[in-house]
Amino acid sequence: MTASSWELLALYLGALLLAAWPLGIWLARISSGRLPGWMQRVEAPLLRLAGTSADQAMNWWQYALALLAFNALGLLAVYALQRLQAVLPLNPAGMAAISPDSAFNTAISFVSNTNWQGYGGEASMSYLTQMLALAVQNFLSAATGIAVVFALFRGFAARATGAIGNFWVDVTRITAWLLLPLSLVFALFLAGNGVIQNFDAYKDVATLEATSYQQPKTGLDGQPLKDAQGAAVMENVRTDKQTLAMGPVASQEAIKMLGTNGGGFFNANSAHPYENPNALTNFFQMLAIFLIPAALCFAFGREVGDLRQGWAVLAAMTVMFVIAVVAITPAEQAGNPLLTPLGVDQAASALQAGGNMEGKETRFGINASSLFAVITTAASCGAVIAMHDSFTPLGGMVPMVMMQLGEVVFGGTGTGLYGMLIFAILAVFISGLMIGRTPEYLGKKIESHEMKLTSIAILVTPILVLAGTAVAVLAGAGRAGVANPGAHGFSEILYALSSAGNNNGSAFAGLSANTPFYNTLLGLAMWLGRFGVIVPVLAIAGSLAAKKRLPVTPGTMPTHGPLFVLLLIGTVLLVGLLNYVPALALGPVVEHLMLWPAH
């Protein structure tokens, strides 16, 4: 890594720490209900409208049923808006209705906080669909994840009550007093720095010269046509005009990052200058992705009565994050050995970023693109400023591994921390076995019931990813979507399932995934990957809440020091990553060995 790479990383972590600490204090107050009186008076009518109140607690299965019903209704609403958008207002570009399979996939994608996009936003979605369906779910899916980790906080902090809070109260407070205020401020900042915010019709402008190109031919339903072999039917196009898409971008961009959603208003996502114009907006977008996940660590420490617990979890996350950045940046700075015999200068200098610049924006370069790639995949965000499919084999493997760890390195809003706490429970259990003592974490005994639920929560996503990859590789419809042969084609499929199953949403975009096969397969992976983990986590929270809190004794294993941090990191790497080693060996590892030794 160059000196500038280290400087950017240090600046980022310093700014993150400064911003996350005060937000963590506020998150703890929201979780515990210690809000100013005027806020409670504002939210009271909303809660009455929902038929509940702030003092009406739920047990874990009531909380889970409310959460599942809420998200199921969101799924139906997003699906309906897509299917009806052709006859609804705020559609100046005349977008057609989305096909049933694509609408199904997109609805699950945004409800599950994955934001996988098999479509191009500016070519498919009306302004109404973007705002009322997708942007709304950006708020609600993020609030759902934070609500679940709040419930887990209460499970650790409760003293034999069995109650873990009220889902409706949590979602209302998180949305009203956290996500909306932060998004408003961030949207104003983005709009002031060049991110567009309007309802104008698309604008046609003349280009400097005529351009000829090929594009997939589409049918009446707006979907690409396929030939008998399943390949896209191409058509030749010549034009001297360019269409500039417009829209209310800044308002959606803010919650896209703060909620670790990641779904772009435009197909190029945050590489598009209308979403991310310059280095300043890019830095703050990176900061926004990790802001709430980092702040939740501090809130966790406050809620369980020991700030050191939050620092320990944050330290484990940060160490793994830094290792990933240190791995990906040199891989991208090394460049492509196939270009060296052609006399291409790939050395970094004052005049060029050097390295592997394929698929990257010159306004960001290698350092920011590599850092962003790790942030967005560590945090289950999935927004991109560079095409991960164009990274070097090892450079592309790092984002894949970040997802396959279970999105626990900071992770999504709420999801990252509850995922890491599940690994903490496992780490405590393993340490208890080694010393012959009943394991306990934060004063709660970890027994067979909790370990069964922990095993389910950890194994759900690897099963979905590996089984889904096997199905896609074996099925003709799955192989038809692969643009590249050999190891990289396998990596494209593995990346897609890793992204969907772990609710990230980024892609190796060479995979043609907007087909009935992939829309269905990835949709199921996203839904089960989201709620197949949430339900066991809530069950663990309920089980812990019903237990008494034990006093600390000389035999209690400390869970706030460097030893526990190392144990936690080791547990995440050994349990979370070993599942995928054979698959990674068939994809990026083989591709790397084919690329470098021969050159």
Swiss-Prot record:
Disulfide bonds: none annotated. Its main location: membrane. Coiled coil: none annotated. It comes from the Bacteria. Signal peptide: none annotated. The chain crosses the membrane at residues 8-28, 61-81, 133-153, 176-196, 280-300, 311-331, 366-386, 391-411, 416-436, 456-476, 521-541, 563-583. The keyword Chaperone does not apply. It is found in: Cell inner membrane. GO terms for molecular function: P-type potassium transmembrane transporter activity; potassium ion binding. InterPro entries: KdpA. It is a multi-pass membrane protein. Keywords: Cell inner membrane, Cell membrane, Ion transport, Membrane, Potassium, Potassium transport, Transmembrane, Transmembrane helix, Transport. GO terms for cellular component: plasma membrane. The system is composed of three essential subunits: KdpA, KdpB and KdpC. Part of the high-affinity ATP-driven potassium transport (or Kdp) system, which catalyzes the hydrolysis of ATP coupled with the electrogenic transport of potassium into the cytoplasm. This subunit binds the periplasmic potassium ions and delivers the ions to the membrane domain of KdpB through an intramembrane tunnel. This is Potassium-transporting ATPase potassium-binding subunit. It comes from Polaromonas naphthalenivorans (strain CJ2). The gene is kdpA.
